């Protein structure tokens, strides 16, 4: 008999941060707000989250298109995960959902936090908008080593 993994999974919680065109919080802080809301809405605790997924992963180019990745959010929430996926290899925004379904079906994890961060409007209002890092400015986060190659 054919087994359909998507029928054995469910979206149990949803969270959303404040939305603005000039955010007073960082992209990571907004993502943390939404993640905590989703975890609470699902009736879970941070300790019960054992997977994390996003698309397309963290981009350190200053555009705000995808400013937060799995590693940054995992660290901010102090999550201990067995599985994560946060790359642009998936076929679009729903790629993170399908990756999570596969991970749950494979028994790699049970409760996956899926998120998508966008900060484009705020990024356009900053000195970083649509530019590479200027001399003297520091890049932070897990992709700091890649900044010279963007």
Which role fits each region the language model picked out?
Residues 1-28, 37, 137-138:
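Condensing-enzyme catalytic core mediating Claisen C-C bond formation in acyl metabolism
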Residues 13-15, 49, 78-80:
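A short alpha-helix capping/helix-coil boundary motif
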